[in-house]
Design a protein with these regions (language model features):
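Active-site/ligand-binding neighborhood in enzyme catalytic cores
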Residues: 1-45
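A structural signal for well-ordered alpha-helical segments within the folded catalytic domains
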Residues: 18-25, 72, 207-210
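A short acidic-Thr-Gly-centered motif at the start of a beta-strand
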Residues: 27, 51, 56-58, 181-186
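A structural signal for the hydrophobic beta-strands that form the central parallel beta-sheet
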Residues: 35-37, 67, 192
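Conserved flavin/dinucleotide-binding core of flavoenzymes
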Residues: 127-229
Length: 229
């Protein structure tokens, strides 16, 4: 767990030097298969013992497919989702968050000595709060200050990037579904992974992806591909 909401027993955080893109580039260097960019998948079909991936350009058949995306996106891709897939994947809700990279210090504590990696800001005691990350401290960046703010209540000055992302909401329904996700994995050759298997963090997505790859390997162990016949 990230420990953001607790004051005691804070975990020791570590970051990947030069940012999270480093592990994506490392995967790309080691991956022996083919990576197709700008090829959005429109539908996943389970037909005659294999899985068909439908894109705008062509269809391709596979022995197994891993849907490494948000649970609601995975559910929308399935041509004929099972009742269990509808129940578990559909139980996860998502919230769209605005994420702004900027250099506006007004989103930080007035005293610089109080700046930390994560900083919460509230205008009213019972009002909404914004969370700002001090990227210089997190990524050991020298020089100009850079901050990453989630859902800023006011528009920051000196914006470098302004994006919207969907984050899972871990309510009671989501946590109950999360405990049963392993029950739907592998049905008809379709496997699932994503940060929603954990707490929505990069580490959760990575761990989930490795687990899905291992489950595919175990499921296909000793089998002859139907596509080679």
């Amino acid at each position: 767990q990230h420990g953001l909401l607790s004051m005691d027993d804070q975990p020791q955080w570590r970051v990947i030097r030069s940012g999270a893109t480093q592990y994506l580039e490392a995967f790309e260097r080691q991956f022996k298969g083919t990576i197709k960019l700008q090829t959005p998948v429109r539908q996943i079909q389970r037909v005659d013992g294999f899985v068909r991936v439908v894109t705008d350009n062509a269809d391709a058949a596979f022995d197994a497919v891993i849907l490494a995306c948000h649970s609601d996106q995975a559910l929308a891709l399935l041509e004929q989702p099972s009742l269990l897939e509808q129940q578990l994947l559909g139980a996860m809700r998502y919230k769209t968050s605005r994420v702004v990279l900027h250099s506006d210090p007004s989103f930080m504590p007035a005293r610089r000595s109080l700046w930390s990696s994560w900083n919460a800001q509230m205008y009213e005691l019972d009002g909404p709060a914004t969370l700002s990350f001090w990227m210089n401290r997190i990524q050991s960046i020298r020089g100009q200050d850079f901050f990453l703010t989630l859902n800023p209540l006011t528009t920051p000055r000196q914006i470098w990037a302004d994006r919207k992302y969907a984050h899972p909401i871990f309510d009671n329904a989501a946590l109950q579904a999360q405990s049963r996700l392993k029950d739907l994995d592998g049905e008809g050759g379709v496997f699932f992974c994503g940060s929603y298997w954990g707490w929505g963090l990069h580490e959760d997505g990575f761990t989930s992806g490795v687990g899905a790859a291992e489950r595919v390997q175990a499921a296909l162990q000793g089998q002859t591909s139907l596509l080679s016949e």
